[in-house]
Amino acid sequence: MKYTLSVLVEDEAGVLTRIAGLFARRGFNIESLAVGPAEQKGISRITMVVPGDDRTVEQLTKQLYKLVNILKVDNITEIPCVERELILVKINASTSSRPEILSILQVFRAKVVDLSENLLVLELTGDPGKVAAIQQLLQKFGIIEIARTGKIALTRTSKVNTEFLKSISMEI
């Protein structure tokens, strides 16, 4: 199973190195990692996706708290969240394939951010499922390059059913 951890850290040099070192020493893998400033000055939020089981994540959380500059570690895997990723895709786009590509982009609300005679660079922001879906649909055109951010997530404060919201956004 994949787990999403939200970690608040002091914005100090070496924090990410210590976290990566902990993962390496313990033999844990980081599948996805995103780091950026949090709501408070001097604090950063690290969102990471790690494979494992409940026991592994519990052990990892305890180990993270032992590191200097770690303020808070939350396993938000089972908590309703707003999750987003960004993907940039450079694909082959001949004149004949462009209409089909553009119709796919319209369905996903993706944008063309660069183009040349035979290539397009596309941008999409969405939940990880949406990002994976467009990536799969674009395979047949010939993907040249992909740059994909790690997942970022914030827990929902409302009691709104996340699955219900996903179903509504897919209908629109």
Curated annotation (Swiss-Prot):
Keyword Transferase: yes
Disulfide links within the chain: none
Record's keyword terms, sorted: Amino-acid biosynthesis, Branched-chain amino acid biosynthesis, Chloroplast, Plastid, Transferase
GO molecular function, one term: acetolactate synthase regulator activity
Coiled coil residues, start to end: none
Family label: Belongs to the acetolactate synthase small subunit family.
Protein name as catalogued: Acetolactate synthase small subunit
Source organism (scientific name): Cyanidium caldarium
